[in-house]
Amino acid sequence: MRLSRYFLPILRENPKEAEIVSHRLMLRAGMIRQEAAGIYSWLPLGLRVLQKVAEIVRQEMNRAGAIELLMPTLQLADLWRETGRYEAYGPEMLRIKDRHEREMLYGPTNEDMITAIFRSYVRSYRELPKILYHIQWKFRDEQRPRFGVMRGREFLMKDAYSFDVDEAAARLAYNRMFVSYLRIFARMGLRVIPMRAETGPIGGDQSHEFIILAETGESAVYCDAGVLNLPIPDETIDYDGDLSPIVKQWTSLYAATEDVHDAERFALETTEGQRIETRGIEVGQVFFFGDKYSKPMNANIAGPDGVERPFQGGSYGVGVSRLVGALIEANHDEAGIIWPASVAPFKVGIANLKVGDAATDAACEKLLAALEKAGVDVLYDDSADRPGAKFAKLDLIGLPYQAIVGPKGLAEGKIEIKTRASGERVELSLDEAIERLIAS
């Protein structure tokens, strides 16, 4: 992609309204534009990251055996009345009426709707287990939206829902999603800690929030430092096997959000040098809620004995748009963003230091063509900006590699490759640079 044909509205100054690093850098890097309090347009650079984050989530959900569908953003109020949640949810729910005066709402979550879908089609335990998921925009009318996409009113979520014949089977589904979450976040280069948490308005008797430790986090968290060194399951994980040892390993050490934190237990179960008391960013949460929705909605299935019973269920959310902000909070320096390669909007940024010079232009064109042919995402800065501005721009938007091409280096048959994360610079021939960037 040539920058001259791209839309990248870089801001030169730090936006005054941005309170945290991720919000400031997303605005400066031309990733988002605020349209109203807590509501953003995703501009091309930001959308590329959002799509890559969503694709990793999708791949790991599919790997774990979940099945994708798509539910609407608008829901009927009557559906929520069946479970008693319409009145109980509070002012965060945006309630509307259509032209026929039917009460509707902009969905903050989808447990009620997915239960209605399930009861319409599934009748027997023989059709179970099932895990269904979707990736969809949601709306919660936060009283004080802040921190950019970290606490917006409109946001993109992945929600999965499990359906099982009994509690034992439902707990297995919980473990399956728990393990898949470890993989999702690890693929993005994030160290995330599952912590015991309140179930809140979703309900149920078991929940874990997946937390990134960060001083800019919204809530206090407490954990044993040992959780930072636990192994992540690799791509060979067998989701049909026994996952309980992995879950037990990750939940045996103390880790809790402030809502369920027990100071006495924390002191007993950890040593002084191992205690971490800090703040955290929630990027996902899993719930086991049993028959909380199936029972009031009469979503019953016939068991092996022929007797009908409510299905046992769970709910599993990942904040896709929030993850973009969390990734920046975890990966930045004074110059800008440092994207992990798996979610970077482009892998390589090419800086042409003398646009109009025949040799420099030709080298850049060869580099661009070779990388794009190999399937590498490239942003080619072919603008007339001075070199310093180009370097600052590439550092700000955080692409993993920068290919710096100018007459001085080319006179010696070299171009420079800079690795954004380490700052390492190496001079290579054009062909060597192409080979290295494709292989990286």
UniProtKB/Swiss-Prot annotation:
CDD domains: ProRS_anticodon_short, ProRS_core_prok. SUPFAM superfamilies: Class II aaRS ABD-related (SSF52954), Class II aaRS and biotin synthetases (SSF55681). The keyword Aminoacyl-tRNA synthetase applies. It is an enzyme of class 6 (ligase). GO terms for cellular component: cytosol. One of its GO terms (molecular function) is ATP binding. Keywords: Aminoacyl-tRNA synthetase, ATP-binding, Cytoplasm, Ligase, Nucleotide-binding, Protein biosynthesis. InterPro entries: aa-tRNA-synt_IIb (IPR002314), aa-tRNA-synth_II (IPR006195), aa-tRNA-synth_II/BPL/LPL (IPR045864), Anticodon-bd (IPR004154), Anticodon-bd_dom_sf (IPR036621), Pro-tRNA-ligase_IIa (IPR002316), Pro-tRNA-synth_IIa_bac-type (IPR004500), Pro-tRNA_synthetase (IPR050062). It comes from the Bacteria. It is found in: Cytoplasm. The keyword ATP-binding applies. GO terms for biological process: prolyl-tRNA aminoacylation. Its EC number is 6.1.1.15. It catalyses: tRNA(Pro) + L-proline + ATP = L-prolyl-tRNA(Pro) + AMP + diphosphate. Homodimer. Catalyzes the attachment of proline to tRNA(Pro) in a two-step reaction: proline is first activated by ATP to form Pro-AMP and then transferred to the acceptor end of tRNA(Pro). Belongs to the class-II aminoacyl-tRNA synthetase family. ProS type 2 subfamily. NCBIfam families: PRK12325.1, proS_fam_II. This is Proline--tRNA ligase. It comes from Methylocella silvestris (strain DSM 15510 / CIP 108128 / LMG 27833 / NCIMB 13906 / BL2). The lineage of its organism: Bacteria, Pseudomonadati, Pseudomonadota, Alphaproteobacteria, Hyphomicrobiales. The gene is proS.
